[in-house]
């Protein structure tokens, strides 16, 4: 068997429907769109979620909640993520961004106590949870606000 002798299995390669290419094709004339009306026109048809005039689901369901524009977005970093830093490293927002631990828009960064710390880090400009503070200080690190 050679490469040029290979052919796809029967029915695996379906031909596309070429509409509007003459009456002999069986799809000429109205091009499978029917006679006149909104759905025959260019740009015709219904929008996604249209239910035939029935009140659509997104309008039947009640509105809930609101977006608080004063809310502060706080990104979370766990102690287990900080192993990549060297001993006695100063960890601040810029250092976390540089290593790829935090991305995007945010107001503050908070260090949480999930994981263990074996190195003495100095944290700057970070919020720190109680358990994280205990683990950092036990490892000989410090926190500067």
Curated annotation (Swiss-Prot):
GO CC terms, sorted: cytosolic large ribosomal subunit
GO BP terms, alphabetized: translation
Keyword Ribosomal protein in annotation: yes
A Pfam family matched in the record: Ribosomal_L27A
Region listing for Disordered, in residue ranges: 1-58
Biased segments, Gly residues type: 21-31, 42-52
GO molecular function: rRNA binding; structural constituent of ribosome
PROSITE patterns, per database record: RIBOSOMAL_L15
Keywords: Ribonucleoprotein, Ribosomal protein, RNA-binding, rRNA-binding
Domain of life: Bacteria
InterPro entries with a match to the protein in the record: Ribosomal_uL15, Ribosomal_uL15/eL18, Ribosomal_uL15/eL18_sf, Ribosomal_uL15_bac-type, Ribosomal_uL15_CS
Function: Binds to the 23S rRNA.
Assembly notes: Part of the 50S ribosomal subunit.
Annotated family: Belongs to the universal ribosomal protein uL15 family.
Name this polypeptide is given: Large ribosomal subunit protein uL15
Annotated source species: Desulforapulum autotrophicum (strain ATCC 43914 / DSM 3382 / VKM B-1955 / HRM2)
Name of the gene this protein is made from: rplO
């Amino acid at each position: 068997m050679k490469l040029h002798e290979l052919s796809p299995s029967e029915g695996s390669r379906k031909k596309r429907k070429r509409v509007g290419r003459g009456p002999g094709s069986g799809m000429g004339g109205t091009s499978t769109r029917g006679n006149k009306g909104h759905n025959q026109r260019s740009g015709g048809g219904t929008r996604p979620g249209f239910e035939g005039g029935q009140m659509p689901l997104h309008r039947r369901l009640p509105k809930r909640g609101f977006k608080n524009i004063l809310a502060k977005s706080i990104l979370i970093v766990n102690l287990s993520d900080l192993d990549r830093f060297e001993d006695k490293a100063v960890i601040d927002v810029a250092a976390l961004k540089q290593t790829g631990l935090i991305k995007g828009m945010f107001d503050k960064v908070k260090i949480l106590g999930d994981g263990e710390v074996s190195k003495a880090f100095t944290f700057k400009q970070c919020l720190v949870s109680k358990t994280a503070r205990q683990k950092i200080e036990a490892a000989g690190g410090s926190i500067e606000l």
